[in-house]
Amino acid sequence: MQVSRPLTVSASPKGLSGRTRVPGDKSISHRSLMFAALASGRTYVTGLLEGEDVLRTADAMRALGATITREGADWVIEGRGVGALTEPADVLDMGNSGTAARLLSGILSSHAFNSIMTGDASLRSRPMRRVTVPLAANGSEFLTREGGRLPMAIRGTGEAKPIEYRLPVASAQVKSAILLAGLNAHGTTVVEEPVATRDHTENMLRHFGVEVDVSRIDAGGRRIALTGPVQMTARDVTVPGDPSSAAFPIVAALLVPGSDIWIEGVGLNPLRTGLFTTLIEMGASLSIENERVEGGEPVGDLHVRYSKLKGVDVPPERAPSMIDEYPVLAVACAFAEGASRLRGLEELRVKESDRLASTVALLNVNGAETEVIGDDLIVKGYHGPLGGGTVQTHMDHRLAMSAVVLGLAAQKPVNVDDTAFIETSFPGFVDLMNALGAGLTP
């Protein structure tokens, strides 16, 4: 059982300053391990996020027959080939990682063996039906707890049928699970999404030699298709810095007077940079320098300086490009001049916690004024001193880091009930923030 780590956060005594790098992108790290295990040959991965979530994925792929070792700063994966994974001898424990659980469900559905998947208390409370229902169309079977929750037994099929599915709600995880099931299916798998979601799966499949066809449909939607079964060839991967992790020092620097920081090597996939666009609309001094391409993904260095922010109206179609950043964006909105409206946040209700409700609670207990109308969050802007509350994080790493950011800029200390789960996505978060001058004392 993980030991809790409460933390009291007081305003930073001076502006944040310096240059830093955030850990590797979590989405790309998960996929690099999974795809390398499905490829034929040896893959070297540089910059892998070594957080608990990603290490669970490494353990799962080892249990399925891949050889995964660490050599210096690199991770080395000896792949099995598509369709050649082997039945695990034990339960696959995905810890806190919904991404790993959902993507791996797609892979397991088209392998002819049985497996059982579980997770921690938080993951076991999250619904899986929006993945298992479309996946079952390929001939696989899923047995879950009531409400479609883990633990889950999966009876994969060696004669997987191709799936054609239109997502009712945009979700990169559901899209990816279906595409991964299609790698070992006979025929063309098609996923249609109402708005474009992060496309790391499509990019990395191409990197490993898979032909993926992407076309535009409707108003901003996309059709993604691939024809299986495929062969994947081992290719080395360089993982860029995670823009979702960069969000926390970015917002902290914008809110703490006198701050001036650089964050190097951050991934700039256009389907992941909605937060940067939004902050600039709010008046943030945030610039991108030294843009380049590494491992098939755009990368750049971010320069961030303290800024007086103004309220913003965020359209719902931007949600997929910043779905993990809404809690820390809401913190920024609480310090802004004027009200902000963050629209179309239904996806937040099925994250590690009900992130919409948890974000509202985080703000309200620290003196901010909020209102929820349907799936929209309204933050009424700065109306007086903030802080002084205790934040219940519900084992949600992003909520915990958002609370820390609020505390660094608030007039009164903020108590965070548990920061232990930050390690799932951002190992070394406190040390990184302290190196910039945050003055956090665990």
UniProtKB/Swiss-Prot annotation:
Pathway: Metabolic intermediate biosynthesis; chorismate biosynthesis; chorismate from D-erythrose 4-phosphate and phosphoenolpyruvate: step 6/7. Phosphoenolpyruvate binds at residues 26, 98, 126, 173, 355, 398. Gene3D superfamilies: Enolpyruvate transferase domain. Residues 1-11 have a biased composition (Polar residues). Its main location: cytoplasm. One of its GO terms (biological process) is chorismate biosynthetic process. Keywords: Amino-acid biosynthesis, Aromatic amino acid biosynthesis, Cytoplasm, Transferase. One of its GO terms (molecular function) is 3-phosphoshikimate 1-carboxyvinyltransferase activity. Residues 1-25 are annotated as: Disordered. Monomer. Belongs to the EPSP synthase family. This is 3-phosphoshikimate 1-carboxyvinyltransferase.
